[in-house]
C-alpha cells in the first residue's frame, strides 16, 4: 500500500510541471533597494541594477516565446528578503527559478560566469524546517496532502519531501549545465560545471532553482561589458537559449533577437581577449590546435609558454586571437600543434620512449593492483564506516550524501524495515 501511495505522490508531484504549457520561469534579479550587492571599482556600477536589467531582457525574450512565461520577483529598485523571493515564485506557480547575480572578488584578476545549485546539506536542513511547518508542508504537497492526511506516518512525509528535493537538485543541475554551455559562447567560465552551495534563494524543494553569476564586477574588463546594455542582452539571450535547449533538447530558439544575432559574431571577434572559451578553432594561418589548454600561473608569459611547449609566440597569439602580449592569471590558453618540432622531439627521444613503454608494459599488472588498493584505501578514508542519522533525515538523503545506492545500504543494514531510519540510529556504509 505504501509503495502505491509513494508512486501516486511522485507522479502527481512531478508530472504536471512536465505537461503544463507554457512553462513559467521565475526570474529573480539579485539584491535591490537598500541592498546594492557588489559595487564595481572603476565605474561604480551597482549589482542590483545590472541584475534587474538582465532580468527584464530575459523576461522580454521568454514572453515572445509561446512555450514560456516570464515573471519577475521584483520589477524595480526595491528590497525583497531571500525567503520572499521563493514565495513569490511559488505564488506565480513557477516551474523553475533563475536568480541573476554579478560576482565580485578581492582579486581584480578573477573573471568569468558560473552557475550554482542547492547543496545536499542545505537541502536536508530545509527539509527539516518544512516538516515542522504544517502549513508549508500542506502547501508543498498540494493535492497529495489529502492522501497523506489519512496516513499518520511522518516517514512518508519525509520520503515525499526527500524525493522532491532530490528531483529539484538534479533538474537544477542539468539546467545549469545547459546555461553554462551557452555562456561559453560569449564569455569566460570561472567554473565549467554547476557548483553546489548553501544559498537561501535555492531553497525551494518544489521549484528547481539555479543562481547565475554573470561575471565579475571587480574585473575591469567584465565591469565594462556588464555596463553595456548590448552585452546584458547577450547574457539574457544565452540564458534563454539554455532554457530552450533544456526544455526541448534543441537549440532552435523561436525568438530571434535581431540585435543579438547581428552583433554576435562581430562582438566575439572584437572581444576575443575576453572570450577564451569561444568555440572558434579555425584561423586564417591554418595553425593547428594541439588540444592542450594551459591555465596561466603567476609569473608566466608568452615566452615561457613558448619554451615549455616548443612553439612560436606568434602562433600562440594567432591561435588565441590575442590582441595583447601579456597573459592574465588563470587564463586558459590554447597551445598550437607544431608538427616539425614534434617530429624532431620524437626522433631524439624515441629510444627513451620505447624503454619506458616496455617498462610500463612489464609492470602493468603490478601497477593496476597497487592502484586498486590505493583506490580502496582512499574510498575508506572518504566514506566512514557508519553514519549517525540526524533529525528528519531519511535513507534517501543518506544515499545522496555518500553516493551509495539505497539497495546497497539495505543489504549492509538488514535490520532496517522498509528503509525506515530513526534519529540517532547508526547506519553501516561499507564493509571494513
Swiss-Prot record:
Where does it reside?
Periplasm
Q: Which cysteines are joined by disulfide bonds?
A: none
Domain of life here? Bacteria
What EC number(s) would the UniProt record show?
3.5.1.28
Record's catalysed reaction(s): Hydrolyzes the link between N-acetylmuramoyl residues and L-amino acid residues in certain cell-wall glycopeptides
Q: Specify the MurNAc-LAA domain's residue ranges.
A: 25-244
The answer to keyword Cell wall biogenesis/degradation applying to this record is yes
Q: What is this protein called?
A: Probable N-acetylmuramoyl-L-alanine amidase AmiB
Q: Which organism is it from?
A: Haemophilus influenzae (strain ATCC 51907 / DSM 11121 / KW20 / Rd)
Q: Which gene encodes it?
A: amiB
Q: What PANTHER family does the record point to?
A: N-ACETYLMURAMOYL-L-ALANINE AMIDASE, N-ACETYLMURAMOYL-L-ALANINE AMIDASE AMIB
What is recorded about the domains? Answer: LysM domains are thought to be involved in peptidoglycan binding.
Alphabetic keyword roster: Cell wall biogenesis/degradation, Hydrolase, Periplasm, Repeat, Signal
InterPro entries attached to this UniProt entry? LysM_dom (IPR018392), LysM_dom_sf (IPR036779), MurNAc-LAA_cat (IPR002508), N-acetylmuramoyl_amidase_3 (IPR050695)
- A single GO BP annotation from the record? FtsZ-dependent cytokinesis
Recorded GO cellular component terms are: outer membrane-bounded periplasmic space
Q: TM spans, by residue?
A: none
Q: What is the lineage of its organism?
A: Bacteria, Pseudomonadati, Pseudomonadota, Gammaproteobacteria, Pasteurellales
